[in-house]
Amino acid sequence: MALNNTYEARLVQQETAVGAGVQILLLALLGSAIGMGPAGWLTGLAFAMATWAVLSRALHRTRPRSFGPANRVTLGRAILVGGVTALVADSFESSPPVSLLVGLTAVALILDGVDGKVARHTGTSTALGARFDMEVDAFLILVLSVYVSTQQGPWVLLIGAMRYAFVAAARFAPWLNAPLPPSMARKTVAAMQGICLLLAGADLLPYLGNLAVVLLALGSLVWSFGRDVVWLWRNSRKATPAVAQVAPEQRGEARAAEVRLTVRADVRAGTRAEEREMLELAVR
């Protein structure tokens, strides 16, 4: 059994290594097609190595029996996101191939709805898979916001940075880590971000049109995060009084138990003393 588990773990880790290899192959194809510069190459390679390292560590900790079909789809999306990341980094050195950038991004966004359906259809939904999917989505939005910010201004970076700011804030405010109720509005807003940024990045609309699209994305995201933060805060405030009410009762029960133990000990000590006195009298 141990040998089988080791063999399965190796197969799972091999899939992440294959993903890194495919990522490097995609970078080579992009490099030969557009003559990608050092910035694009280094950024793409850094993304490939970071994805491989983080995913391998997560798989080592969770030890799944197989990588799973849904995770393979998500890994494919991550490879495409790595290509988009390399192209965006290269755009700071030379004019970007917009059609290629839009094409890779569009496929990555389309596949975003595929991995979840595959997981549900095959019964392979896992917490790791959901987190993997979420991180790929968040990083793609961050990269797209960097690209669009070169056209609309640095304020666009708020779209990509908002999720990471929320995660960072949760370290100082643990109540932000509480689970949220399912929300179709939240899912819709999340899906809108990639579509709006892709539309603005494709530069199909005039400047004011692209500006309106990006403002719509940012406004809806602020509303969604704001609504969730308010709900979490109110929920934490409701939970605090309940804890405060239960705590004194628990302390009272503990005190009563302590008193009962003390009384029992005193009774036992008194009984033993009486027994010793009776023995002494009998000896006399």
Predicted region positions:
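Broad hydrophobic/π-residue packing in well-ordered secondary structure
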Residues: 84, 117, 128-131, 145, ...
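Juxtamembrane helix-boundary/capping and inter-helix hinge elements in multi-pass membrane proteins
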Residues: 121-128, 150, 176-177
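A feature for the membrane-embedded catalytic helix bundles of lipid/isoprenoid biosynthetic enzymes
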Residues: 1-71, 134-260, 275-284
